[in-house]
Amino acid sequence: MNEFINFDEISRETWQNLYNTSIAPLTYDELESIRSLNDEISLQDVEDVYLPLIHLLRLYKKNLEDMSYSKGLFLQKIVKTPPLIIGISGSVAVGKSTTARLLQLLLSRAFPKLTVDLVTTDGFLYTTDDLKNMGILDRKGFPESYDMEKLTSFLYHVKNGERFEVPIYSHETYDILPNQSQIIDSPDILIVEGINVLQNPQNQLLYISDFYDFSIYVDADEKLIEKWYLERFDSLLKLAKYDQTNFYHQFTKMPEDKVLNLARETWARVNRVNLREYIEPTRNRAEIILHKSENHHIDKIYLKKF
């Protein structure tokens, strides 16, 4: 069976003609400031791919507002429009973070009077100490290493317009930062980015996917993702070379061939397994799939039919 049977496959050329605009509403420097390590993105990508996507999100937001108004008429009371929640998923090193930050910037420009917040699910990882106590430190990144109950609670509070403090994760220390949090307080639009965004925990009355009004999966061939992962690992080592507080600094003392073997082993033992067993199987839950080819070039878009 065709795994994309429930999607319309749209070429980049067709997609870019669905919404015509003269210029991207951001500068090259702004785009560079939100680009993730080893990701590649251009102003042409913004115009060809992301501006039509923003236009589509406008339609989803309008639909959410119309539905809230209609419910209010039916219930004969004022029903406040809940925040539009957008989920972004995909493998490590595929470019989710760049997509999330770019959408936050573009949505802020498209809706200048609205609050657009961004949260990564890394903040819902258990701390390193907790993972050690649970005996699952070697499973970090897998579903059981996340506090899914807390993530679900967060989404519930946001949908109900309530304030919530989200833990902050540091890739430099490879752990949750103690006594630090990101405050999310009644945003109009919330973007949630992470590998587990579309995963549903077992035995829950509420599923994470229940809270999303729109979801995106950033996709690519597994071999390409592995290549990007190894390139990113190398870049992280270079950044950590003179920073002894950085988690990756410990690897800078090792011979290059051993470090490369370690990165390949980590990919094969952790990230590839996680991708095949837990991340990629959630792909078809997304409303839209952004497919990447070489150099992070988005060549195809899959839009869910129904």
Swiss-Prot record:
| Pfam families noted in UniProt | PRK (PF00485)
SUPFAM superfamilies listed in its UniProt record: P-loop containing nucleoside triphosphate hydrolases (SSF52540)
- By its UniProt entry, which InterPro entries does this protein fall under? P-loop_NTPase (IPR027417), PanK (IPR004566), PRK/URK (IPR006083)
> Which compartments does it reside in?
Cytoplasm
> Coiled-coil region(s) at which residues?
none
Keywords per UniProt: ATP-binding, Coenzyme A biosynthesis, Cytoplasm, Kinase, Nucleotide-binding, Transferase
Entry's Gene Ontology cellular component terms = cytoplasm
* Binding positions for ATP per the UniProt entry: G90, S91, V92, A93, V94, G95, K96, S97
**Pathway annotation:** Cofactor biosynthesis; coenzyme A biosynthesis; CoA from (R)-pantothenate: step 1/5
EC number(s) given by UniProt: 2.7.1.33
GO terms, biological process: coenzyme A biosynthetic process
The Swiss-Prot or TrEMBL record annotates one GO molecular function as: ATP binding
Q: What reactions does this protein catalyze? A: (R)-pantothenate + ATP = (R)-4'-phosphopantothenate + ADP + H(+)
Could you say which protein family the record assigns here?
A: Belongs to the prokaryotic pantothenate kinase family.
Q: What is the protein's name according to its record?
A: Pantothenate kinase
Origin species, per record, is Lactococcus lactis subsp. cremoris (strain SK11)
Taxonomic lineage is: Bacteria, Bacillati, Bacillota, Bacilli, Lactobacillales
Q: Which gene name does the record give?
A: coaA
